[in-house]
Amino acid sequence: MLRGVLVWIRKVCNVCYNIGRHCVYVGQYTTNRNYGDALGVWLPKLLNINRGHILPRRFVFDWQYTRGTNIQMVGSTLGDVDEHSIVCGAGAVSSEQLPKAKPAKIVSVRGPLTRDIFLSQGMDCPAVYGDPAMLLPLFYTPINVKKRYKIGLIPHYVDKDAPGVRLLCQNPDIHLIDILLPPNRGLQTSIERYWKCWVDELCACECVISSSLHGLILAEAYHIPTLWATFSGNINGGAFKYMDYYKSINIITPPHINFCCKQDMDTSFLIEQTTLKDTSAIDKVRYKHLLESVL
């Protein structure tokens, strides 16, 4: 109740404070604790930190959002794209997901599969690829991090209680990293409070096994060997978004392991399956400057 009142007050303050200013809106209506999706709110702020008026969706009224510019940056948010959208690295969750309307501008998309969807709808889309979450090391990299865990396990939030995850967690060499951030406190979002702590935990792992796309993307951005895993059939869109991302860095057949079937859980075997991915197909510094020029 109190939180709802505080959010409403924040909305009113945003209306008053930003009269006459050009604002852009980011994120979904609900507060998203999924680390990857939450970066869709936080990264635009990092990219625009000294300049402007970027407001989270939850802190503006519906009439503001529907009239203003919205940024679709991180995550499978193609279905949220409308005529007021600027697409900066967003992707599709499946080949069936379509934009609501032709966006105001497409700067980049997550990968070539997302681009194909825009082209199939008769919308021009540049062959500029990259999930902006890959840029996080340009804003923060832990110094003198100690590798405390042999394997970091990052299941997608729908896989948290999957049998394969529970079995892996019995291995003392495996450290579970929750892709869901702690609950928000007041008006400060979890991503503001914990984004560096999550990266610290990630970088303390020698390698990473993940069914979360952003678990893979962020580990690879920090040059940690990874293995894409499947623990269930519950992830919306199946392999589509993973292949979209991997094709953006010129990996056509990424290593993959299916834990729905019985697999050898020996630590050395699992470590041998992880590989260090080359993400140099995307010039991160140049990509950062491109997104900054838009915001």
Segments predicted by a language model, with ranges:
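Active-site anion-handling motifs in enzyme catalytic cores
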Residues: 1-295
